């Protein structure tokens, strides 16, 4: 028995866990976005 790869990408899971709406939903998430804007990130969230 071998162990499986732990990263099994799914678009829905990615956006629900790390997406923009999820970030905007909490005050800490908004802080994350503010930090990334201040740093000049091209992509703010998944």
Swiss-Prot record:
InterPro entries noted in UniProt: Ribosomal_bL34 (IPR000271), Ribosomal_bL34_CS (IPR020939)
One example of a Gene Ontology biological process annotation: translation
Residue ranges of the region described as Disordered: 26-46
GO molecular function: structural constituent of ribosome
Keywords, ordered alphabetically: Ribonucleoprotein, Ribosomal protein
Gene3D superfamilies per record: 1.10.287.3980
Any one of the GO CC terms: ribonucleoprotein complex
Keyword ATP-binding assigned: no
Matches recorded under Pfam families: Ribosomal_L34
Keyword Ribosomal protein: yes
UniProt feature, compositional bias: Basic residues: 32-46
Family: Belongs to the bacterial ribosomal protein bL34 family.
Official protein name in the record: Large ribosomal subunit protein bL34
Organism whose genome encodes this protein: Lactobacillus delbrueckii subsp. bulgaricus (strain ATCC 11842 / DSM 20081 / BCRC 10696 / JCM 1002 / NBRC 13953 / NCIMB 11778 / NCTC 12712 / WDCM 00102 / Lb 14)
Classification of source organism: Bacteria, Bacillati, Bacillota, Bacilli, Lactobacillales
């Amino acid at each position: 028995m071998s162990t499986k790869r732990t990263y099994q990408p799914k678009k829905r899971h990615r956006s629900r866990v790390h997406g923009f709406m999820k970030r905007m939903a909490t005050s800490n998430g908004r802080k994350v976005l503010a930090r990334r804007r201040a740093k000049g990130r091209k992509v703010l969230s998944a």
